Amino acid sequence: MTQGKIIKVSGPLVIASGMQEANIQDICRVGKLGLIGEIIEMRRDQASIQVYEETSGLGPGEPVVTTGEPLSVELGPGLISQMFDGIQRPLDRFKLATHNDFLVRGVEVPSLDRDIKWHFDSTIAIGQKVSTGDILGTVKETEVVNHKIMVPYGVSGXVVSIASGDFTIDEVVYEIKKLDGSFYKGTLMQKWPVRKARPVSKRLIPEEPLITGQRVIDAFFPVTKGGAAAVPGPFGAGKTVVQHQVAKFANVDIVIYVGCGERGNEMTDVLNEFPELIDPNTGQSIMQRTVLIANTSNMPVAAREASIYTGITMAEYFRDMGYSVAIMADSTSRWAEALREMSGRLEEMPGDEGYPAYLGSRIAEYYERAGRSQVLGLPEREGTITAIGAVSPPGGDISEPVTQNTLRIVKVFWGLDAPLAQRRHFPAINWLTSYSLYKDSVGTYIDGKEKTDWNSKITRAMNYLQRESSLEEIVRLVGIDSLSDNERLTMEIAKQIREDYLQQNAFDSVDTFTSFAKQEAMLSNILTFADQANHALELGSYFTEIMEGTVAVRDRMARSKYVSEDRLDEIKIISNEITHQIHLILETGGL
């Protein structure tokens, strides 16, 4: 423990002297109030400290005391359904302790509740040899999550005592005699420094798709479990709604939602909506698998920088249990702005647009902690972390540094488009500029598992949209009547794909989520109509005849997005009606 004194205060940056015994990344208690800070730079005996609380009122001469520990999070039962700030202070218990709606400075509240007793079921025998990552037992944390208690990193030996029963998270549950003869007394909780990635046994190639229930994502721009995706877009294009939708309905075991520097109302929406929503995969409330980290725009800037690391460390902990985890960061641009502010106060040489030169490596550091891994310990298991980051480029300009550095690392780009949002087409993901490098592998995976020709259907649908884009210019110049019947049919089919398939209402109880089976049935109907109508044109029918003769069936196709999942047969029989209607047109018209 080192004690120094403040010599300079500049916003969230405090400089203290007499700190020659301190280490970089040590946590400090700053000033008489004991504000939490982290050492980010050392020069001789002077330490630059970024303070995670409001620094107004601090002055030179006040004490600074180091704890000798890095910024760490507590990992154990009690994380799920909780809402923390950027440095893992529980907001509900913080309010109870301070009787204040705002964060009172210098108050210490344990991250995990020390009073709740959790029922621990041991799955291991006394005398058994264990090592890092081995599962010792489970705690039923919620109806959905079985919290697995693992041997902490760096501990191995023989179990000399372990018991099932009810324990608080700081009571000794098991004892291990280590190889050097010393004893390790373990609790249900462990600590881990947030800036250090948790180790794994082996990195694996992600293959299984993350099913989100959002048709434009699952069909055209899929992300795998263990993949990384970016959602850049201008203000009002729907970044937060896309993130909320994925957080609500993704087929993962755990969701960690980091609200980083965005509006407080958006976190309020999450708190109001999530408890009422039922997870289609488990039938339980979505909050029973969710951890929220709220670091809204009016909270201290430095804590924004920590919130991303806090979230990804929690995600790694659940991954080590063998779970699939999705982490949403909304928005990484605000996190980058926090980096820029601290860099400016440190008087570092600025890079592009004032961001620090190390922006790219920091962004890469975050996304590289995602992935599919074989984790340490027995029984052998795999875990995945899928990282989805929103990016808010000023004015929607994706050539700015945060977006460009993000796109260098992630493999999926869901580009939100202001003109689409203005036309009320949501999700406003532009199908011409977005891309997914997982598309082929996901298509092959689905074709093999579901025994379908999903990959070829997606390719055909995308071809229609691309052809529509090239025809639109002709239509704008000389009008739609100048097109041939074949080209007009192409425009009509592309319109059906856009409006009846890609457009989705997040606020409709049925349309908000679409299972893979329903997605395939809807797309198959559109492509069946395309095949039958093209066939009719070849046999001499006119485009207007086909449109007039299929009004009713096309209306049913458009309404199929509002047909509930338990009535899928109603969607599947539409293809027979399409064939029947086209046959009637051929019998009564054409050549």
From Swiss-Prot:
Residues the entry annotates as binding ATP: 233-240
EC number: 7.1.2.2
UniProt keyword Chloroplast, yes or no: no
Alphabetized CDD domains for the sequence: ATP-synt_V_A-type_alpha_C, ATP-synt_V_A-type_alpha_N, V_A-ATPase_A
Keyword Ion transport: yes
SS bond partners: none
SUPFAM superfamilies membership: C-terminal domain of alpha and beta subunits of F1 ATP synthase, N-terminal domain of alpha and beta subunits of F1 ATP synthase, P-loop containing nucleoside triphosphate hydrolases
Keyword list, A-Z: ATP synthesis, ATP-binding, Hydrogen ion transport, Ion transport, Nucleotide-binding, Translocase, Transport
PROSITE patterns found in the cross-reference section: ATPASE_ALPHA_BETA
Enzyme class: translocase
CC annotations in GO: proton-transporting ATP synthase complex
GO terms (BP aspect): proton motive force-driven plasma membrane ATP synthesis
Pfam families referenced in this protein's UniProt entry, alphabetically: ATP-synt_ab, ATP-synt_ab_N, ATP-synt_ab_Xtn, ATP-synt_VA_C
One function term, GO molecular function aspect: proton-transporting ATP synthase activity, rotational mechanism
Catalyzed chemical reaction(s): ATP + H2O + 4 H(+)(in) = ADP + phosphate + 5 H(+)(out)
Entry's family note: Belongs to the ATPase alpha/beta chains family.
Function noted in UniProt: Produces ATP from ADP in the presence of a proton gradient across the membrane. The V-type alpha chain is a catalytic subunit.
PANTHER family registered for this protein in UniProt: H(+)-TRANSPORTING TWO-SECTOR ATPASE, V-TYPE PROTON ATPASE CATALYTIC SUBUNIT A
Name of the molecule in the record: V-type ATP synthase alpha chain
Encoding gene (name): atpA
